[in-house]
């Protein structure tokens, strides 16, 4: 029902004129789900300064928690604090403790991101970030894309050659370190990274500078922070750059964060499963050449295990 008149008067009681919108009641009716069009994932209520602040603090949290955990471990062992550098490099348990310290660092990062995105609880966290599928994406399409990225990465590494990286040495330092790496790479890292890079950072940069600039900056930032742990393996760095590009383009195309998270989760999760199963697969895989039957599993394990991405 649309009210065309500019006003109505109840003559019997002398009611003063009450103005109504000429376009109709539907224009002043709030959305049924309570959502406001004022903000969206591409028009966020936070700016670049807040986004960069959360990004910087994510590194501060990692540094502080790692330092606290390592010092606590050294005090427990009654070790010389002056030799902390040497102990951390050579003690497998110290390496495990350093990896484990990233769990509270990730938790603190999410808390800070929540404060920025929600305005301290005034807005819904996930919905403000765009936590739904968007155009053309489902769980299985996202998972299939993750598998395709893994295969593409395997091809890149095969062509460029595999060089031992810092993360390789970390995973190989102990079984505990390998399992902790697999846990973080699956349970916390995909969610934290997507919230920070494709959620908080991308949204703020896109609003301020446009989609193209936002894509370029986020792709490069995400890839750049992984270079130290994968240097000097250019194949792995290239794979991470490809992953970063695809995830950011998905965010730009759909305006949503959930597909990025699922691709990231499956990409890391498959490699984490291989890390967990690696000791058992080594026992069942015969030491044969790649051309013989059954050897491909061994080749894939050896190809993927050293290159799981953690942060």
Go through each PLM region and give its residues.
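Generic structural microfeature
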Residues: 99, 123-125, 138, 200, ...
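Helix-boundary and loop/linker segments of multi-pass membrane transporters
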Residues: 40-44, 87-89, 130-134, 168-177, ...
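Residue-level signature of transmembrane alpha-helical entry/exit and packing/kink sites
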Residues: 47-54, 94-102, 138, 142, ...
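N-terminal, membrane-interfacial amphipathic/helix-forming hydrophobic leader that caps
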Residues: 1-128, 154, 272-311
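Generic alpha-helical secondary structure signal
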Residues: 123, 137-138, 165, 177
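Interfacial segments of alpha-helical transmembrane regions
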Residues: 130-148
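Transmembrane helix-loop-helix hairpins at the membrane interface
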Residues: 14, 20-24, 35-37, 59-62, ...
């Amino acid at each position: 029902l649309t009210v065309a008149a500019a006003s109505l008067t109840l003559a019997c009681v002398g009611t003063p004129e009450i103005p109504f919108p000429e376009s109709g009641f539907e224009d002043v009716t709030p959305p049924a789900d309570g959502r406001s069009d004022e903000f969206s994932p591409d028009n966020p209520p936070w700016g670049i300064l807040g986004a960069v602040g959360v990004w910087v603090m994510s590194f501060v949290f990692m540094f502080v928690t790692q330092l606290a955990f390592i010092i606590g471990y050294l005090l427990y062992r009654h070790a010389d604090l002056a030799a902390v550098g040497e102990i951390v490099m050579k003690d497998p348990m110290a390496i495990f403790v350093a990896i484990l310290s990233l769990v509270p660092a990730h938790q603190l990062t999410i808390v800070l991101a929540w404060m920025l995105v929600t305005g301290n609880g005034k807005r819904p966290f996930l919905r403000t970030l765009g936590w739904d599928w968007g155009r053309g994406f489902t769980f299985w399409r996202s998972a299939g894309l993750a598998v395709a990225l893994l295969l593409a990465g395997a091809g890149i590494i095969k062509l460029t050659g595999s060089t031992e990286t810092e993360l390789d040495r970390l995973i190989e330092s102990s079984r505990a370190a390998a399992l902790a790496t697999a846990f973080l790479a699956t349970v916390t890292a995909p969610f934290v990274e997507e919230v920070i890079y494709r959620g908080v950072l991308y949204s703020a940069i896109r609003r301020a500078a446009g989609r193209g600039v936002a894509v370029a900056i986020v792709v490069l930032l995400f890839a750049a922070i992984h270079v130290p742990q994968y240097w000097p393996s250019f194949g792995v760095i290239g794979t991470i750059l490809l992953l970063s590009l695809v995830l950011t383009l998905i965010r730009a195309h759909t305006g949503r964060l959930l597909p990025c998270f699922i691709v990231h989760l499956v990409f890391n999760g498959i490699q984490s499963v291989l890390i967990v199963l690696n000791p058992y697969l080594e026992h069942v895989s015969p030491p044969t050449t790649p051309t013989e039957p059954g050897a491909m599993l061994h080749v894939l394990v050896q190809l993927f295990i050293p290159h799981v991405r953690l942060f």
